[in-house]
Amino acid sequence: MAEFVRAQIFGTTFEITSRYTDLQPVGMGAFGLVCSAKDQLTGQPVAVKKIMKPFSTPVLSKRTYRELKLLKHLRHENIISLSDIFISPLEDIYFVTELLGTDLHRLLTSRPLEKQFIQYFLYQILRGLKYVHSAGVVHRDLKPSNILINENCDLKICDFGLARIQDPQMTGYVSTRYYRAPEIMLTWQKYDVEVDIWSAACIFAEMLEGKPLFPGKDHVNQFSIITELLGTPPDDVIRGICSENTLRFVKSLPKRERQPLANKFKNADPDAIDLLERMLVFDSKKRIRAGEALAHEYLAPYHDPTDEPEAQEKFDWSFNDADLPVDTWKIMMYSEILDFHNIEQANEGEVLVEGAGTAPQGFA
């Protein structure tokens, strides 16, 4: 039986195994608090995420189960990896992952990025998305604060709590507004992996400009700002709008022409503009896919088709439509945690090679 110790962090009780020491708060989300810690077993710094009251409602239980299953399944250099998971005596759940020094949001607010860093970060984002999408998963909440970076410029996508199956009938209103694809705002359904490409494009533009591309005050303003740059949506996109209210709103907007992105990004490389044009497309079916984007000329310094893997198998979403009581989710969670530890013991000594390509020099 593991020995647990308690610590108070921002008024929140962290109840963790004695394997982890030197807790320091690093971030707070809607569903959990994240602390850095030292892993006494490996000597390495780690991030410990406490999931608040995971068994308080069936919805929270299912969300936690989904994130756990995804973190177990997704094994890729550009995706955050799970190193430990446990349930405390107080029945909180703790995810332990590798610790990266910063995130892209903090980086963007502290300094302008040079071209080679923008290329390398975008390359790694798309490399991770190619893998995730091949597993049948859509992240749905890609934004700079969910992109972690270390001092070697290794980049990892995190926070899969909102991720969903690839499904032409997806519903919901999920990602942070600035990075949200127009099809989510327009239809509230029928969206797929392309929503992540739109988010990646918004992040790419923010790296180029140093500020958000579409900083909408609300979803109406957000959509209006998008049309100022990209013009009025094409007729086939408008025909796909399901909500009468949304349809009336879109038709009420003045007709606008798409503006050349080169006019907005005056200092950007022409290849960067070309890739951005292919990512920022209203019609999601015409938006470039992650694998295609990796082969674009702008990313040529890092592109290696032999080192951009896809998932070996699709993620099992069979639980996703289940409407189960908390106790059932809890049993399923215990089973997954037990399975994780059995797999970890079997795989001891197996190490992922860190970092894709060769990082640019001079980043600190």
UniProtKB/Swiss-Prot annotation:
The top EC class is: transferase
For molecular function, the Gene Ontology terms on record are: ATP binding; MAP kinase activity; protein serine kinase activity
Catalysis: reaction(s): L-seryl-[protein] + ATP = O-phospho-L-seryl-[protein] + ADP + H(+); L-threonyl-[protein] + ATP = O-phospho-L-threonyl-[protein] + ADP + H(+)
Q: Pfam families from the entry?
A: Pkinase
**Notes on activation and inhibition:** Activated by tyrosine and threonine phosphorylation.
- Provide the positions where the record notes the PTM Phosphothreonine: T171
Instruction: Please list the residues that make up the active site.
Output: D141 (proton acceptor)
The protein's PTM annotation reads:
Dually phosphorylated on Thr-171 and Tyr-173, which activates the enzyme.
Please state the protein's primary subcellular location.
Answer: cytoplasm
Its EC number(s) = 2.7.11.24
Which coenzymes or cofactors are required?
A: Mg(2+)
Q: Name one GO biological process term.
A: stress-activated MAPK cascade
Motif TXY is found at: 171-173
**Does this UniProt record's set of keywords contain ATP-binding?**
yes
Q: Where in the cell is it found?
A: Cytoplasm; Nucleus
Q: Which residues bind ATP?
A: V26, G27, M28, G29, A30, F31, G32, L33, V34, K49
**Assigned GO CC terms:** cytoplasm; nucleus
Q: Provide the Protein kinase domain boundaries.
A: 20-299
Sorted keywords for this record are:
Activator, ATP-binding, Cytoplasm, Kinase, Nucleotide-binding, Nucleus, Phosphoprotein, Serine/threonine-protein kinase, Transcription, Transcription regulation, Transferase
List every position bearing Phosphotyrosine: Y173
PANTHER family according to UniProt: MITOGEN-ACTIVATED PROTEIN KINASE (PTHR24055)
Stated family: Belongs to the protein kinase superfamily. Ser/Thr protein kinase family. MAP kinase subfamily. HOG1 sub-subfamily.
The record's domain comment reads: The TXY motif contains the threonine and tyrosine residues whose phosphorylation activates the MAP kinases.
What function is annotated for this protein? Proline-directed serine/threonine-protein kinase involved in a signal transduction pathway that is activated by changes in the osmolarity of the extracellular environment. Controls osmotic regulation of transcription of target genes.
- Mind telling me what this protein is named? Mitogen-activated protein kinase hog1
